[in-house]
Regions:
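Nucleotide-activated sugar donor-binding and catalytic core shared by glycosyltransferases
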Residues: 1-246
C-alpha cells in the first residue's frame, strides 16, 4: 500500500503542501519537488465572506442588538448554549444545528426563556420583538449569518470533532468550541493566539464569554487577532495557479 502511493507521488512534477512539516516529511522519502503553498481554505472562506449577502430575516431579528451565532451544533453543545442564552437576556442568539433533529429543535424552543423562532417559519409579517433565539433550520446561509455576529461558537467539539472555525474567524469573530479540536491546525493556532477558546463545561464557556461581552477593548483586540490570522494565511490559491501556468 505504501509503495503504491509512493509510486503515484513520483508521477507529479510539483507537489503543493500546506506547511513545512509536510515538505520535510516528503523530503525524507526522497522528494524535493515540493512547494509550500499554504491552505487554500483560507482563500475560500475569504471569498465566501466577500460574497456574504444580507438576509432580511436576520436583519429584522437582530435589530440593534448584538448577536451570538452558534454554527453546526450537536446536542452537547446545545446543552451549554441554552444556559448561555438564558443567562444573557440582552443578547440575541442564532443556533444552527448540524442535524435538523425535531426533538432537539423543540427542546431549544421550549427551554429558551426569552422566546424562540424557527427560520423556516418566519415570514415578512413575523414580529420578532424581544424573541431571543432564532433557530437556523435551513442550509446554505450560515456563512452569511456569521457576518452579523459579534461572537461565535462552533459545534462538534464534544463529538466527532469541531466543524469549520475559519468561516467565523474570517469575519473577525472570537470563537469557542468543545474539547475535540486538536487535529485541526487552524483551531490550535487560534487558541494559541487567544482568538479562540476550548471549553469543557458551561462555567468555562461563561468565563470566556463574559469578558468579551463586557469589555469592548478586549473584544476588539480579540476580533483583530482572528481577522489578522485568516488574512495572513491567504494566498495559497494564487501560488498554485501561478506555478502551474508559469
Amino acid at each position: 500500500y505504501g509503495g503504491m502511493w509512493r509510486q503515484a507521488l513520483e508521477s507529479f512534477d510539483v507537489m503543493f503542501v500546506q506547511n513545512e512539516e509536510s515538505k520535510k516529511l516528503l523530503a525524507t522519502l526522497g522528494f524535493d519537488n515540493v512547494l509550500v503553498a499554504g491552505d487554500t481554505r483560507f482563500d475560500r472562506v475569504a471569498e465566501i465572506a466577500r460574497a456574504a449577502r444580507r438576509i432580511d430575516v436576520i436583519d429584522r431579528f437582530k435589530g440593534d442588538n448584538r448577536l451570538f451565532v452558534a454554527g453546526s451544533t450537536w446536542e452537547p453543545d446545545e446543552e451549554l448554549l441554552i444556559r448561555l442564552i438564558n443567562d444573557n437576556p440582552d443578547v440575541k442568539f442564532v443556533v444552527a444545528p448540524h442535524e435538523m433533529d425535531e426533538s432537539r429543535i423543540a427542546r431549544l424552543m421550549a427551554e429558551t426563556k426569552g422566546g424562540a423562532l424557527r427560520y423556516t417559519q418566519c415570514t415578512p409579517r413575523t414580529t420578532y420583538g424581544s424573541r431571543q433565539l432564532l433557530i437556523l433550520d435551513t442550509v446554505g446561509i450560515l456563512a452569511s449569518v456569521y457576518g452579523y455576529a459579534t461572537w461565535s461558537y462552533i459545534g462538534g467539539g464534544f463529538c466527532v470533532g469541531i466543524h469549520n472555525t475559519l468561516e467565523a474567524a474570517t469575519f473577525g469573530l472570537p470563537v469557542a468550541f468543545g474539547p475535540n479540536y486538536e487535529k485541526f491546525k487552524e483551531a490550535r493556532d487560534l487558541v494559541t493566539l487567544g482568538a479562540a477558546r476550548s471549553v469543557t463545561d458551561y462555567e468555562q464557556l461563561r468565563t470566556w464569554f463574559v469578558p468579551l461581552r463586557d469589555n469592548e477593548e478586549f473584544l476588539q483586540k480579540t476580533s483583530r487577532i482572528a481577522k489578522d490570522y485568516t488574512t495572513r494565511h491567504q494566498g495559497a490559491t494564487g501560488i498554485i495557479v501561478k506555478t502551474i501556468f508559469h
